[in-house]
């Protein structure tokens, strides 16, 4: 982790720097906020800024963001003046570290803010095969395309590959191609010279140069404009880039990783992605299975997130109840690991008893998780779905959806909660669908007695 310290290195701040270095940080130093912005602009990469709270933190953050240099900031200061600490947080600092420093606090803050040491939590055989392949190709210089649904952990996998590579001690730089406007992405990747365009007040080093010697991750590369893909292809082939407004090519030594949640082969057919670029990137493909295809990972991930967020919130770590585990495994998790992480974060905060009960685990819409269906009910619903699928040819999507919901509900004996769980939708969504069908005159199976059966 690269730490840029901003402020005068005297007394307690110097001690804090030594503690950060002992915690594994690679530390560099400037005295003023202007020097900090200039250092970032010149390509001195940083994962975190530690800034003395007597300096203009708001101005520093504004100056950096004006040039799209979004590096998290933690404030620090002697005597822990409450007003100054509050103002630093209000200005945009993620955390405040009081000085004299505490070694454990500094290590915890560095880990929490940068969050770049996410381990690979793997128990399921499907994911173990992916890890095995990643371990094989990580030491090479091959470009790797990491594919999978949104939230399945593609960036975590990219960091894992970098950590296992021969470039592990060099920078890992990530660019989200979907989050940066098309007209700015070229400058973000390749940098620009002073005066290259309106607002280019100074030379800016791009991500390719910042990653020199290390790894560059092109996140969601499928969202990149076709015109820019041509320039990217040349940079990958020639290992040199042209800054916007520059006259001389710049050599770079990097390894390229890329991620996508779209089918790039189909994008090639649609004309939105270059076939030659796909071949360059897809030397090795690591496909991350969605969470629903690796159920053995669910509880291990849950326990990891409980530990993480209990520590982050100063809450005693609790075990997960047996019923909660059953529901967690049965849920389909359309948002994958990201959705599961958010659910467990909420559960840590909402749990009131000695265990994390099933009622503390809430879905994104605030609804509790549905009970796990018993085997007989699940098998009956599957048979209903199989039988229905044979009659779906020639029907509209809405008609297919309606028939599937009605058939599943019938085989769940009217139990709304069980049916919603099998269908992979929330109970609220199911009830809204059933009301819509009833209003249209469709016969809806009545609810039966028992927990979760009420309409």
From Swiss-Prot:
It is found in: Cytoplasm. This is Transcriptional regulatory protein FlbD. SUPFAM superfamilies: CheY-like, Homeodomain-like, P-loop containing nucleoside triphosphate hydrolases. GO terms for cellular component: cytoplasm. ATP binds at residues 148-155, 211-220. GO terms for molecular function: ATP binding; ATP hydrolysis activity; sequence-specific DNA binding. FldB is transcribed during a very brief time in the cell cycle just before the periodic expression of FlbG and its other target genes. Keywords: Activator, ATP-binding, Bacterial flagellum biogenesis, Cytoplasm, DNA-binding, Nucleotide-binding, Phosphoprotein, Transcription, Transcription regulation, Two-component regulatory system. Residues 2-114 form the Response regulatory domain. It comes from Caulobacter vibrioides (strain ATCC 19089 / CIP 103742 / CB 15) (Caulobacter crescentus). Its main location: cytoplasm. Activation of sigma-54-dependent flagellar gene promoters and strong negative autoregulatory effects on its own promoter. The synthesis and function of FlbD in C.crescentus is controlled by an internal cell-cycle clock. Residues 416-435 bind DNA. GO terms for biological process: bacterial-type flagellum organization; phosphorelay signal transduction system; regulation of DNA-templated transcription. It holds the Pfam family HTH_8. PANTHER family: TRANSCRIPTIONAL REGULATORY PROTEIN, TRANSCRIPTIONAL REGULATORY PROTEIN FLGR. Residues 120-349 form the Sigma-54 factor interaction domain.
